[in-house]
Amino acid sequence: MADRKANGGGASASSSGTNLLFSSSATEFSFNVPFIPVTQAAASPASLLLPGEDSTDVGEEDSFLGQTSTHTSTPQTFSYFSQVSSSSDPFGNIGQSPLTTSAMSAGQSALPKPPATLAFTTGSQDALSAFPPSVSKAPGATPPSQMGTSTYSPSQPSSLPPNFGSPPQGIPQQGHNPYRHTPVSSRANPYITPPQLQQCQMPGHSSYPPPSGPPVQTYQMPPGPLPPLPTAMQSPAQQQVPARPAGPLVQGPSPFVLQNQYEPVQPHWFYCKEVEYKQLWMPFSVLDSLNLEEIYNSVQPDPESVVLGTDGGRYDVYLYDRMRKSVYWEEEPTEVRRCTWFYKGDTDSRFIPYTEEFSEKLEAEYKKAVSTNQWHRRLEFPSGETIVMHNPKVIVQFQPSSVPDEWGTTQDGQTRPRVVKRGIDDSLDEIPDGEMPQVDHLVFMVHGIGPVCDLRFRSIIECVDDFRVVSLKLLQTHFKKSVDEGKVSRVEFLPVHWHSALGGHATGVDRNIKKITLPSIGRFRHFTNETLLDVLFYNSPTYCQAIVEKVEVEINRLHSLFMSRNPNFKGKVSVAGHSLGSLILFDILSNQRDMCVSKSPGSVAVSNGVIKHSQFQEKLISEESKLMSDESCDLDVEDEEPLTLHGTLEALSLFDYISTFEKEKIDMESLLMCTVDDLKEMGIPLGPRKKIANFVKLKAAKLEQKKAAAEKKAALAALTKGQDESAPKTKEMASPSSESNESKRKLSVGAYVSSVRVDYESFEVGTGQVSVAYSSLDFEPEIFFALGSPIGMLLTIRGVARIDEKYRLPTCKGFFNIYHPLDPVAYRLEPMIAPDLDLKAVLVPHHKGRKRLHLELKESLSRMGSDLKQGFISSLKSAWQTLNEFARAHTSTTQLQEELEKVANQIKEEEEKQVVEAKKKKESPELSKDEDYLGKVGMLNGGRRIDYVLQEKPIESFNEYLFALQSHLCYWGSEDTALLLLKEIYRTMNISPEQPQH
């Protein structure tokens, strides 16, 4: 370069006004204005990608101008992966495109060529070393490779020039990027207007320095910011030359331009979640991520205590610790990351975020690459990862065991590089918009049999999460107008987990059942074991009280916690139960009292999920003791006057038969044991016999009442004693010691529930129901939703043959029994209320506003059958008319004609009746309306229908037994079920859904 500069300088000195390109003596070359070939105009994308080819062309142009250096280096084959870094900067060995030169003086005949490669490092260097005036190459030196190899080391800020990142002083910034706004490359138009013509076209600019000064070199700014030249290294002419725009014919940009456009990456926050024993990184919603980013970028007085609620307030994020913790239930804390860079391998289904520190390093290197426009770079990190940045869109990561060799192949042929991605796509469908902070309605959902809720063995928390997501989507499709108007926000669903109250693992029941379980169809047997255990536990006196108390305490705890975190909540509360959970809720709601009673001093007090039993005991003991004292007084009076045989017969006016009873050796005790047949054999007449039988019946009933009262009194005393010792005894139940295990278990169980005789509420038939002490809820539920409920079956087993039409839940207005037609656990309730009405369950509409295809096919087939029937009747009518005409023609009997006319009229009436019924079916939907039977199905749901059946899927209709078990667990992801709940909830707010928008 030094030789080129010297030659160029000599040429300029010898012929200041003549250009070497047009110094030929040929007459046909006559130009008024000389043209100067440009070595490289504004760099086009093609020229940036092929620096070696551009440098070759530049060399040819310089050779044509007589500026060829005596020491020309021959390009050699370079390696992408075997270059050795000469500096700590990973971009130091990457080849650069040659820099352009532009004429600044009108008297220059030839322009010196700038250095072929301008080193752009972040190491310790000054501005003088960044822009040397001349660069000389040693003979045989190989050009730098386009792709260098470097070990990652963070750049030192102290080594940067003070004005790094900004254009040199005195030169205004240009507002465009040369790599984006240059339409034509230097090859397409290699000429620019000479300085003389530019000076004439721009008279407003200052004059150029005189030719006697040193040659002015103005380089086109390489990609990235250039440090300013020291003032001492600049000539006075250079310090005075301002920037001037290019003329109209200039295709390239102005000499000094801005760096390439770098846009900071938009971060998004993620959290780690374990799904089916795999850790998945799930994105926060857009709203939660923006809130986290805002708090992250703000200044907090106490950053360690910053807690932000996410996921609608169900989780808290501790920003300093990067942890996400649940609010309403027990769950392991999970990690939170501020993510900007991601990777995905062959076996990964989604992009996985890098750590925040590693992402910051990648972002710094990406910024350098964009600023300097240097790509095809390989970054090696101390942990062994190797990342290659080919271009902004193609970035790959090689594992430590699969580092590619110089040919680009990996040692392990099966391992492919990971795809590296910067930022997230704005149009990513899996990122939700976020939940509104306002809650319209609160629903507590109680799980059913077993600790899992579906065939994927997921917990109630995960299933309720799916149900909540489905409800949010339906709000956007079926209540969009109300959502846009601000009338509808969202419904919050909170799970209620009670299975831990059983303590089956501690008592050894689960272990014993495992020993006797057959090894075949293991998953199905595991599911049935959990199912049978819960049903048997709930019907047992040992665990029924524990299950009921657990559900009541958990619901009150969740309600209190929700109200404390949402003090402005003005909505109502509903409850929903699945399977056995619906039966538990039904028993609890059936034994509730009015809120005025539940808020009395005797109600159950809840503080942080612990029941304060003192007031409850006082009320229970006072009420029950009063009742028992009254009964005992009556019984004591009867005991004071014991009846004898003589007294009894005198009271019944049957003393005349005393001899008969004495003859048979009958006393008062044996009299009470006599039956009607015994009295008949003794010769007692019918009248006296009836009197004695009635007396015996009444006396036996009184004795039974006395016995029941005594047992109830003893049970009450034991129950109050057990409540005083409930906390320590429960711990003993949960962890029985090996010593005298049987005796301790008996002691703890006896003190807690059933060491005394358990009272059953018995009926004429059935097993009866265990008497349980119920406490009051802290709220009045608005609606009770039963999903796949066995309430009807268990009530029938208990002995409840019929539910009174006037019966309603004391504190709950609505009740909906929702079930799938193939659910083996679900049962109806309306036949128990109105057995005389043959009503089909209400068919739940499809969430897309139509019936399923196979149901429509059934309707069309039934319609076809009715059409065939009508056709048959019409043909019969025509045949009858033909016979009538034949009879008229062959007989004159008026009586026969009247009979034929009667038959014809009857056929006509039946036909008209069928037409009317067909019209009604077309006008009204197939499903039964609530209004048609308002008040006829009892007051359990306020006079409205109770049973609602979902539409089965077409594939389920092929084999009902195959999908029976799945249908019992389908409610958590059912759009039809969620839409029915939303409709009924917002119906209480006088908000109706519009047509579905799909």
Swiss-Prot record:
One of its GO terms (molecular function) is metal ion binding. GO terms for cellular component: cis-Golgi network; endoplasmic reticulum exit site; ER to Golgi transport vesicle membrane; perinuclear endoplasmic reticulum; perinuclear region of cytoplasm. The keyword Endoplasmic reticulum applies. It holds the Pfam family SAM_1. InterPro entries: DDHD_dom, SAM, SAM/pointed_sf, WWE_dom. It is a peripheral membrane protein. Residues 777-987 form the DDHD domain. Residues 50-246, 720-742 are annotated as: Disordered. Residues 1-363 are annotated as: Interaction with SEC23A. Residues 54-63 have a biased composition (Acidic residues). Interacts with SEC23A. Plays a role in the organization of endoplasmic reticulum exit sites. Specifically binds to phosphatidylinositol 3-phosphate (PI(3)P), phosphatidylinositol 4-phosphate (PI(4)P) and phosphatidylinositol 5-phosphate (PI(5)P). This is SEC23-interacting protein.
